[in-house]
């Protein structure tokens, strides 16, 4: 497996393959990174970073469009997630962070049952939030987990779990867990709204009485 050198962009967010992500670039070193990527038709990698530092597993990012350029050099742009990579070595020579990365090896496991469960839950979540399920989710059955994660707002830590899993089956199991939890939260929120509309009281069943 060959490694290649690319720019690294630590960020408090997680990009997954196929996801479109808007970025606002304001630091000089990352303005330089964007210029280099544009001039060299190169991609860079977004690595999730928090107080513990940047993770070694991330996702490559292709610049789709620079939507705005400001006079002071700041940029608004949109990137698309490419492939999951692992940083094997940090390198020097640029004003921004660079490293040698290699694609992460996938384990081949049958995930048909998990895919069906994840798709059904995704459709339920979309409908519960008043949205239309995106049919594109089923276009790449081998990466359905990423397609769903790109369309549902999950916490960064949970999206990082997806990047760190080595099989589509394992990722879909995470997706099923997250979507099921999300449906529970939506149901609780709906119940709270209903209670608020009735001053905290739940309507009695038919034929029942009421408090004096």
PLM region spans:
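N-terminal low-complexity, acidic/polar interaction/targeting segments
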Residues: 1-212
């Amino acid at each position: 497996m060959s490694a290649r050198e690319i720019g690294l962009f630590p960020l408090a967010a997680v990009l997954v393959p196929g996801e479109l992500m808007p970025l606002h670039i304001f630091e000089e070193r990352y303005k330089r990174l964007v210029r280099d990527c544009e001039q060299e038709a190169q991609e860079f990698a977004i690595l999730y970073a928090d107080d513990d530092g940047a993770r070694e597993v991330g996702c490559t990012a292709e610049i789709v469009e620079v939507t705005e350029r400001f006079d002071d050099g700041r940029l608004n742009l949109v990137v698309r997630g490419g492939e999951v990579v692992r940083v094997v070595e940090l390198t020097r020579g640029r004003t921004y962070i660079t490293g040698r990365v290699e694609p992460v090896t996938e384990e081949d496991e049958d995930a048909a049952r998990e895919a069906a469960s994840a798709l059904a839950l995704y459709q339920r979540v979309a409908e519960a939030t008043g949205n239309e399920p995106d049919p594109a989710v089923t276009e790449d059955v081998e990466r359905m987990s990423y397609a769903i994660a790109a369309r549902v707002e999950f916490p960064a830590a949970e999206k990082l779990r997806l990047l760190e899993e080595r099989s589509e089956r394992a990722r879909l199991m995470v997706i099923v867990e997250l979507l099921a939890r999300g449906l529970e939260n939506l149901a609780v929120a709906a119940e709270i709204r209903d209670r608020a509309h009735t001053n905290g009281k739940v309507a009695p069943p038919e034929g029942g009485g009421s408090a004096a």
